[in-house]
Every structure is written in C-alpha cells, then in structure tokens.
Regions:
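Extended beta-strand solenoid/passenger and fiber regions
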Residues: 8, 16, 169-170
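Short amphipathic, charge-patterned alpha-helical segments
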Residues: 15-29
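Long, highly charged amphipathic alpha-helices
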Residues: 17-21, 94, 98, 139-143
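Auxiliary tRNA-acceptor-end handling modules of aminoacyl-tRNA synthetases
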Residues: 33-42, 48-91, 102, 111-264
Length: 264
C-alpha cells in the first residue's frame, strides 16, 4: 500500500515497520540533526517500530489493511527529529531509559528518582541523597555507553494493571503503585529490558543506539543527566550548576512531601 513519508512515496508491505521504510527511502542518518527519531501520524506520535500495514483479523482470507491512524492521515507520515519539541522529548525518554537501566545494573537495590528538568538536562537523586564519586559516575557512563552500543530494541508491552501493581510493589516503586490504583483502564503499557521494567509517558526511539549523545555529572546531592546541545545535537550541552535555582526546586519538593503530594 502506498504511503508518503516526508512527502516521498513508498510502497509499504504487510509487516514492514516505519523504520524499515525510512531506511528504504534513504532517510536515516547517523547525524542527530537529521536523524528521524519517531513519526507524526494524524497528529499522534508513533515509534518508528510501528507497523502501518497489517493483516485484517477475523477474515477467512487474510487481507492487508492500513491501521487506524494511517488511514486517518490518508497515508501521510511526517518524521520527527531532534529539532522538534516532540522529537526532543522522544530522545530525552530514550536517554533516560538508558540511564535508569545502567543504574539498575550497577545499583540494583538503590532507587533512582528523576526530580526535575532544568537547563540542559535532568536532575536525579540516588537513594537517600547518596553521593556518587567521580569513579562511580564514570562507571555509570561506561555502562550507559555499553547499553547504547548494544542497540537494544525498545518495544512497549501491554500488561494487566493488577500485574503491574504487583510488580512495582515488589520492586519498591510505591509511587507507581499509588498512581496505578487510580488508573481507569485494565491495562498498562511498560518498556522491558531483561529484568528491568518501567513506565514512560510517550514514545521512544526504536532502540537504545539512538541515545548516543549524553553526559553525566555528579552534583552535591545527586546526578545531572545532560541532553544534546540545541545548537549541535551531536555533542552534549554545556551545563553550569546553579545552586540557588536547585535550592528553589528542592524547597518545592519539600513542600510537596509535607503536603503528601510528591507524585502527580
């Protein structure tokens, strides 16, 4: 079936992913400035692992059909890159997954919390204000680089809400347990790699290999995960620690804790 990806026509066969079609058109790139990270289909963000044409179920003779979003878009697909707001968020989620997976492998019993985004990246607290040494931070960066080079496929899995509650409860992630108890649907979407399971609101890049530009710095009370530069996404942004601004965020979190509303 005929699709148009960034205005270029391509014949999509049943079972072929958007990533396959992007590469077929020669639109993939190692340069983060031009590399497609996800796709916009009818106003929604989709992973490039999305398969736009599949067999119609319930038919005695299988028939290929366009999926709902692609039909609504009349076969038009536009690619999201780092220079777009949605593409930027896709990259950030993917980078964050790599970071959390690395921390889980190196510190399996330690809880890591992403506290807030500020400036060029994300501030994370480790355990009970655990402070990592420079050699320990370098070890985390090496593990992140190993995960990136492994190019692990990132696929979302749908699980039963009760099963997700049981898992996160056993894993000590009580924030997610409290949120899930209010969920009105019986299912829950997670990303899984080996024994690490987590929830992210929104799509990711097709694999961990896409998050190859990052940096990690030790702070007095945690870690700072740095995104690619807006001017040149192929290098990490420069981050200057601002203790007064960090103090404002810390005070805000403390008020949230006192008011019992740390999770929204």
């Amino acid at each position: 079936m005929l699709l148009k990806i960034d205005g270029r026509p391509v014949d999509a066969q049943c079972g072929e992913s958007l990533l396959y079609l992007v590469r077929k058109l020669g639109l993939d790139s190692a340069d983060l400035r031009t590399r497609p990270l996800a796709a916009n289909v009818a106003g929604e963000t989709f992973t490039l692992n999305y398969v736009p044409v599949r067999e119609q179920e319930g038919k005695s003779v299988p028939r290929a059909m366009l999926r709902r979003a692609v039909r609504a878009a009349n076969g038009e697909v536009s690619l999201l890159r780092y220079d777009s707001a949605r593409g930027n968020r896709v990259y950030e989620r993917t980078m964050l997954f790599v970071f959390l997976l690395a921390m889980r492998k190196l510190y399996p019993k330690t809880r890591v919390r992403i506290n807030y985004a500020v400036g060029a990246g994300l501030y994370a607290s480790v355990g009970d204000n655990m402070r990592l040494t420079e050699p320990e931070v370098l070890a985390v960066k090496r593990e992140m680089r190993r995960i990136v080079e492994a190019d692990l496929t990132l696929e979302r899995k749908r699980v039963d809400v009760d099963d997700a509650i049981d898992f996160f409860s056993c894993d000590g992630q009580e924030d997610k347990v409290r949120l899930l108890r209010w969920r009105q649907f019986s299912y829950f979407d997670v990303y899984r790699q080996e024994d690490y399971v987590d929830y992210f609101y929104g799509e990711m890049a097709p694999s961990t290999g896409y998050a190859n530009v990052f940096d990690l710095q030790a702070l007095p009370t945690g870690l700072f995960l740095i995104r690619p530069s807006a001017k040149d996404p192929n290098v990490p942004a420069k981050h200057v620690y601002m203790p007064h601004l960090a103090g404002v965020f810390s005070e805000s979190e403390e008020w949230g804790r006192l008011m019992h509303c740390t999770v929204v």
